């Protein structure tokens, strides 16, 4: 397949692996304290496991997994608020499929649907808007979640709802922003992060220039990378070369998709509809300053929480689960005592096992047999 197969070419993959092996000797890092490269995107995590890229690295280079999966950081209380709204008479609650099985304290949206709530899977926010127009006697709620990748589509949908004066359409906001999260990670003492592989999809919207503070303020090299084996390995090579040269810069491996300035039209739509400020709670990580998203005054009439006023929910994570440590690269999924036994894809305890982009789900899918052996 054009534009895919050439980025999976085995000969070129092995050339990059050989180059990494050769250059790794020049790193100051050892097998006991390897160069720790955090891949922030769940898509990167799955590609790394699927193609076994982490097993090809020299012993003094390691991939660690970051909080780059928005479904994985959904707080239990937010799920419970969604269930409360979805269970009300006359409501059609629309969500992406990944969020259906995320557990809250009072179950999941899938369980709410089984109990009679009208919960529907949609593939875009425009699907939810069409449902609202087709069912004027019902109140239709779209559960908007995701990083900057999905925010432009939500913003454009809300613009359409305003222009068409759709009065029965509402938006439950769980959009969050990536950059404050990276700053929060680096502000933690002993974070152990030496370099970043930044997500291609988010960067397509915000550009590469937005990451400048990571290099200037925290002196960490960062490379925006694509999702195929050659992308990720080339990104690792670029980070290794920066580390050897004692440089901390933002580089763009994914130039075929990501412009340095990002997407100005998407950024303008987001700025029109959303206020990119405020605190937001992240599952396993707590409250992160300035990572929240709210509607601007012109769009506040679509705010589902203001309209339905669900009871405030704040649910503490089970202390047995190590979701927060996995999300910050402090432990591997299989090191959690609940992994594969209490928490597995059939009966997920944490969101990292539910989402198709979760590190625990990736480890279970590609490494569980090896781990059991």
Spans of model-derived segments:
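Structural motif
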Residues: 92, 139-141, 195
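A conserved active-site cap/scaffold subdomain adjacent to cofactor or substrate pockets
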Residues: 172, 190-259
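Phosphate/pyrophosphate-binding betaalpha-module
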Residues: 143, 147-210
